[in-house]
Every structure is written in structure tokens, then in C-alpha cells.
């Protein structure tokens, strides 16, 4: 899954004591944010195999440090602890828990779309429901989760809604290109492109949220 992950960010931002939207954007993609440099460094492995699924050409054959269930739980705990260490406040624990759950949500949503390439631990017992092999349904799920979360978010703010909706539309167009466009030229190019997208999306989210009046996070 790609842009659907951001639906979790939008929904979580609606909750009391939630961290800023840009931070939630990073949290829901943290496993992939780590995956990209791990691939570039040769720690995790991926290759381009057109047709391996009907909508994603990436053969993610070795990624135990970012996308095993055990690793996802550990990275969630690390993110929770790091956010909690930044200070106290009446909502600090709740905000830290949201960050941790946002990180873990990545694995849960990936489980739905991936073929069985997500290990439960180390590089063994790989699982995945394989919705990527049904591109129309996979794309519909991405759109539904993204805009469902955004609807919750926009329902709790009084700023301009159109810019955020347009942002979501652009993200969905990028998702369509990922699904139905040509495959990446290399595994390294895929990793770099993904990492740039995560940073740019988080930056845009931070910029757009400045115009929204929503309950301010009370966590430190």
C-alpha cells in the first residue's frame, strides 16, 4: 500500500492529543522510510519483476528488518518511546501511543495488499493477502482509506478544505501511475523515488495544515 497509509494519518489527527499531521505522515510510512536506505545500502533486497503481481512489479524478497511483524512491533515501540521522551504534558502518553499505532498500521495495511512476502519474524513465515493481484480493488482500497481518513480530518477543522482535497487527488494520481504506469528502472531508483515522495508529502501536509484551525495537540 502507498497513499492509503495516509488515511490513517488523517484519521489519527482528528483525535484528541494527536501529534501534528506531518509527523503522522512520517509515522505511517516509517517502515518504508527505513526500507529505502536499507535497500540502497544492501541490507534489504528487492528486484524488479514485471508481472509478479498485477499492479506492483517489486519482488520484495528480503526485508526482515523493516517489514517483518516483529520488526514492525519493535519500530513502533521505538517511535513511541522517542516521541514520549520529548517531554510530558497531559496528553503526552496518548500522543506517543498514537505515534506507535500509526507506525504499526503500516504493516497491517500492507498485509492486505502484499503477496505473501511479509515475514512474521526474521525472513520466515511470510504472509500477505495479495490484493495487488486485483488492481481495481487495490486501487479502490487506497482511495477509500485515503479519502475516508481525510473526511474525518476535514470534519474537525474550519480552515479551507479544497487545498487538502486537491492534495489527496494528486496523491491518488501518483498512486494510479505507480499501479498502471511503467515499472521503475531499477530497485535503487524505486527506493530513492519512494523516499523523496515521503519527505515531500510530509512537507506539503505541514504547509497545508497551517491554514486549518483544529484542536491543538496538548502533548509536549
Language-model segments: which ranges?
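N-terminal membrane-targeting hydrophobic helices
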Residues: 1-220
Amino acid at each position: 500500500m502507498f497513499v492509503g497509509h495516509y488515511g490513517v494519518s488523517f484519521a489519527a489527527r482528528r483525535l484528541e492529543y494527536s501529534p501534528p499531521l506531518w509527523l503522522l505522515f512520517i509515522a505511517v510510512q516509517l517502515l518504508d522510510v527505513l526500507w529505502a536506505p536499507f535497500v540502497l545500502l544492501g541490507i534489504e533486497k528487492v528486484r524488479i519483476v514485471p508481472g509478479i503481481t498485477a499492479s506492483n512489479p517489486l519482488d520484495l524478497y528480503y526485508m526482515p528488518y523493516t517489514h517483518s511483524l516483529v520488526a514492525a512491533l519493535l519500530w513502533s515501540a521505538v517511535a513511541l518511546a522517542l516521541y514520549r521522551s520529548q517531554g510530558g504534558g497531559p496528553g503526552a502518553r496518548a500522543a506517543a501511543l498514537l505515534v506507535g499505532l500509526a507506525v504499526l498500521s503500516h504493516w497491517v495495511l500492507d498485509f492486505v495488499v502484499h503477496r505473501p512476502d511479509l515475514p512474521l519474524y526474521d525472513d520466515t513465515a511470510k504472509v500477505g493477502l495479495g490484493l495487488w493481484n486485483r488492481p481495481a480493488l487495490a486501487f479502490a482500497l487506497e482511495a477509500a482509506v485515503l479519502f475516508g481518513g481525510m473526511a474525518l480530518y476535514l470534519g474537525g477543522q474550519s480552515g479551507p478544505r479544497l487545498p487538502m482535497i486537491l492534495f489527496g487527488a494528486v496523491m491518488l494520481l501518483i498512486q494510479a501511475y505507480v499501479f498502471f504506469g511503467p515499472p521503475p528502472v531499477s530497485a535503487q531508483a524505486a527506493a530513492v523515488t519512494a523516499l523523496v515522495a515521503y519527505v515531500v508529502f510530509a512537507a506539503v501536509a505541514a504547509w497545508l495544515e497551517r491554514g486549518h484551525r483544529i484542536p491543538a495537540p496538548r502533548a509536549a
